[in-house]
Amino acid sequence: MNYLIMFSLALLLVIGVESGRDGYIVDSKNCVYHCYPPCDGLCKKNGAKSGSCGFLVPSGLACWCNDLPENVPIKDPSDDCHKR
């Protein structure tokens, strides 16, 4: 019985853990950040574990972030960059 309670509690804790997501970080206009300044610093400043430079068609070199929080926007492939 005690094992069942401990297992249930552990399962609840694991399910409640918020995980991040990977993707190309974007600004409010769905435009990617290009690889300067270095991506690792930009991604970490926004709560990611790490970042690197990747190639995104048709944007070119863009910052890819690993394990970004849910509140940080990532590239929506169905939407274009709205610079204007």
From Swiss-Prot:
GO molecular function: sodium channel inhibitor activity; toxin activity
InterPro entries: LCN-type_CS_alpha_beta_dom, Scorpion_toxin-like, Scorpion_toxin-like_sf, Scorpion_toxinL/defensin
A Pfam entry, by short name: Toxin_3
Signal peptide: 1-19
Membrane spanning stretches: none
Positions of the propeptide removed during maturation: 84
Any single GO BP term: defense response
Compartmental location: Secreted
Cysteine-cysteine disulfides: C31-C81, C35-C53, C39-C63, C43-C65
Family in the record: Belongs to the long (4 C-C) scorpion toxin superfamily. Sodium channel inhibitor family. Alpha subfamily.
Other information: Negative results: does not show activity on Nav1.2/SCN2A, Nav1.4/SCN4A, Nav1.5/SCN5A, Nav1.7/SCN9A, Nav1.8/SCN10A (when tested at 5 uM).
Domain-level remarks: Has the structural arrangement of an alpha-helix connected to antiparallel beta-sheets by disulfide bonds (CS-alpha/beta).
Official protein name in the record: Toxin Aah4
